[in-house]
């Protein structure tokens, strides 16, 4: 599985997938192997490499199990920029979001993680994306990460204010280090998402919230 170079669960982007060798030199992995197409229904795909999806145990065993649903096939498509995480007030009261930005801890209970779909989205893709969100209960499991999303929003405000970016650029020059705007964002936010890859848990959430 290591040749697939998958470092986080492709279904949820919440758990690391680690490959290692045991004492006997056998390759092991922390991932479960999900049969994208259930072998009981599609026996011809049972041993197909392209039907094996390394995923976390929660997504594979607890969420999906033997359920067969129209979802995104990770090797070919993901949410990308077509489906993005967002943070919304449950009662559509924008004041709750503002209170959270100002540090009101009680206001976070009135917020929820949701998804936004880009306009003119292909209907079949949208169905598969909605199927993935429903099957893996992404709204529910990401609810615990609301505080992280708010933290990203705060860091976005710090970056857009301008002085942090200027300070970091000056510091890097003094250290004779090259630093792009993207590098500065990486340092501030603590996530790396160059080339559209999400190699760290929650990096998709972080990118979507930061560039909201």
Task: List the model feature ranges, each with a label.
Residues 1-14, 41-47:
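Short, charged surface segments at domain edges that flank catalytic/cofactor-binding sites
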Residues 10, 53, 57:
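Cys/His/Pro-rich metal-binding microdomains
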Residues 14, 57-61:
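Short Cys/His-rich local motifs and their 1-3 flanking residues in nucleic-acid-associated proteins
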Residues 16-51, 65-69, 73-83:
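Histidine-centered nuclease catalytic patch
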Residues 38, 48, 56, 71-77, ...:
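Alpha-helix initiation/capping motif
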Residues 62-128:
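Domain-level detector of nuclease and nuclease-like folds
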Residues 107-212:
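C-terminal, charged low-complexity interaction regions
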């Amino acid at each position: 599985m290591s040749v697939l170079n998958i470092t986080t669960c492709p279904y949820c982007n919440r758990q690391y997938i680690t490959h290692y060798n045991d004492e006997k030199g056998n390759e092991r992995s922390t991932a479960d192997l999900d049969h994208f197409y259930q072998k009981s229904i599609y026996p011809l795909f049972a041993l197909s490499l392209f039907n094996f999806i390394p995923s976390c145990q929660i997504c594979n065993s607890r969420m999906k199990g033997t359920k067969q649903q129209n979802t995104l096939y990770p090797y070919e498509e993901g949410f990308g920029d077509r489906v993005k995480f967002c943070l919304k007030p449950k009662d559509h009261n924008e004041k709750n979001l503002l209170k959270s930005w100002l540090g009101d801890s009680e206001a976070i209970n009135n917020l929820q993680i949701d998804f936004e779909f880009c306009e003119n989205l292909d209907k079949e893709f949208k169905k598969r994306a909605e199927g993935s969100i429903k099957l893996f209960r992404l709204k529910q499991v990401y609810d615990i990460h609301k505080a992280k999303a708010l933290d990203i929003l705060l860091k976005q405000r710090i970056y857009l204010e301008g002085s942090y970016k200027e300070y970091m650029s000056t510091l890097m020059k003094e250290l004779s280090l090259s630093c792009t705007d993207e590098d500065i964002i990486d340092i501030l936010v603590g996530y790396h998402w160059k080339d559209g890859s999400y190699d760290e848990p929650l990096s998709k959430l972080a990118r979507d919230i930061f560039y909201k």
